[in-house]
Amino acid sequence: FKTYLTHKATAQDFLQIHLPPMLLQGCNLATLKLESGSFVEENLRAFYSDILYSMQTASGKGYIYALIEHQSSPDQHMTFRLMRYAIAAMQRHLDKGHSQLPVVIPVLFYHGIKSPYPFSMNWLHSFSDPQLAQQVYTGSFPLADITVISDDDIDKHRSIAVLETMQKHIRDRDLMAVAGTLGRQMSRRYNTQEQLKSSMEYLLEAGETEAPLRFVRTLLQHVPQHEELMMTIAQKLRQEGRQEG
């Protein structure tokens, strides 16, 4: 298999014969170039595709990869494996310095005893809920962009409101402007003690305020149960102030 398909002219014939016309018309087979089909995952475990070719698009504006895998026994999850190889090829393309993802066309060469090939070649059909998978993987992914959500709307977000308010305003020149809002959100008892402690430490370490002690006191008015923690932080701020002075 590899002796044949690693030969450029043979690979050109194979793709010209077996690629659907709609895909073939976007490929410039004259620019076909054999690539390494070995990939290494984050856990350093290597995996290999059979054949990987790169080529320019017919318009010359981008790159297309043809990933050819051969199989003698049907595999229910073959399309998922092909997707893993395809995404690995995309990542390698970016690692080379390209700014846009290439289209990777997986092609399965099957020569098993069972005929015809018994499984769908649509990888979405591998999911227990193909309809949901199609909605997730063929549309835009959900986006929680807090930069465009109003503070009033964020204030209604129950246990996530403190986190969203912090992250939205952490780069403000003075966090004092949202101290009251944060204090009220913390007082609603949606959050765990660990979450509130982490929030206070984060605000004072990563945020900016011209009056850090007043900021602490404002929060303390709403969450007096954290007085000990607040006083510890306030004492630290006083010491830092003396050192800076």
Sequence positions of predicted segments:
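Elongated, amphipathic alpha-helical interaction scaffolds
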Residues: F1-E244
